[in-house]
Amino acid sequence: MLGVFVVVSAATGFLLTAMQRQAAVLQATALEAQHEALAEIMNDSIKSAVDFQIYQDAPMDASNGALAPGNSSGDWLVCVNQNGTTRFHFDGAQIECQQTGNGAVQTRVFPGASRASPNNGQPNSDEQPDNGQNSHQPIFNLSNLGIIQGQWNVNTAVDQVPFNVFGVPLQMQ
């Protein structure tokens, strides 16, 4: 009788562990899918932009509707197209996407984001490993060729997934 109890207990333990692992994989897959949707929104916003700016701090709204001068890199990206304005903001743990058009404002939050390391997490021989907390690496930057880049990592219970979005705004194509 004791043998049956041990076998049933072990089988139950294995089953619970497998279910926990499956739940972690499903949560990771859902989080990755959310960030894939964010990358698609960001890509569409960049490529259809008739005006854009990158900011290090929260942008001020100009009274004439034009975007205030920005920076070459920062944690804010504002894209204006014919349908409205899309703002992306990284706050250290999530990316917020706010879309404004025809007077309506839609805000979505994408949790689990962290800064991408400039060397894809692979330290040089004289560097300490980057754990995604590099506060000096903004997620948005503008190259000398006019290419906007958004780069971040998504940290799941299973792994860390890098996301990169590149695009040339409509006005520069």
Where are these regions (language model features)?
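Aliphatic-rich helix starts adjacent to a transmembrane/signal segment
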Residues: 1-43, 47
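Short, cationic motifs built from Arg/Lys/His that form the positively charged side of catalytic pockets
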Residues: 36, 47, 94-99, 169-170
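Type IV pilin-like appendage domain
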Residues: 57-142
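A general secondary-structure signal for short beta-strands and their flanking turns/coil
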Residues: 74, 145-147, 160-162
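Edge beta-strand at a domain terminus
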Residues: 108-112, 157-173
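A short hydrophobic beta-strand element
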Residues: 143-156
